[in-house]
Amino acid sequence: MNISQLSREEIEASLKKNRKETESSESIRIIFSPRKINSNNLKEVSSVFSQLGNEDYHTVVVVETHEGEAEKKLPMPSFKFIETPYGNIETNDQLRNDFADEDDDFFINDDAFDEDVSLHDQLIMLQHTLDNFKVLSIQITDERSFYVKELAAAMEEILASKNVLILFCCDLKSDKIDELKRVVKIIESDNESELMNYLNGGTSSVEGVGAFISGLLVARKWGLRIYFGALHSDSNHQTNLLTGFADMQKQAIFK
């Protein structure tokens, strides 16, 4: 059952249960979320979203891979508001223009925007987690490394000093744990060349691999701690190995 068919009470109960079991973080900058949220993965999605602390994010940027006919490869839908069953959410028009001014491949275009985009599911979850926020949707219609690196570089620069949460939509089936371990090892070794080989080689099992890799690149650039629950013994991740987050590392306090 898709999240749009779940009741408010079901979603809130799942989040509440996970809040009791996890310690919230007030420094999460990135979330990796499945492209579709439903009754089968609500528990694992809640385990991540429930860790959002009291941070008052001004904007949530949702990045996803979605095929379309747009000539430019990084389109952003033109809507001023987007409607969910829980109300309207306003677009951050200024931020959208900032990206459009950054590079020619960012373009305000609706050709890749339809009812199947992941954005709808993510917003419903966010409306149960955050109070007031704006949204920016960025789509990747070409997952070649040139465009993925271009997107990551723009986000690194434009969003670094902004009070923004970035949400990357991607999936990896539960039997691909060795693949996830290999990618994490590549990131930890700071080997961007090997990461691009993984992206371009055609062997990746990740659905939404462009969004996944761009998220890893931004997290690495910002010095964030990347956490995938599937790599830890306390994991309850059963459907998507990539459900996770990246947060600021806590600094030691010396007295």
Regions found by a protein language model. Give the residues of each.
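Long, Lys/Arg- and hydrophobic-enriched amphipathic alpha-helices
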Residues: 232-255
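Active-site histidine-anchored catalytic micro-motif
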Residues: 1-224, 232, 236-238
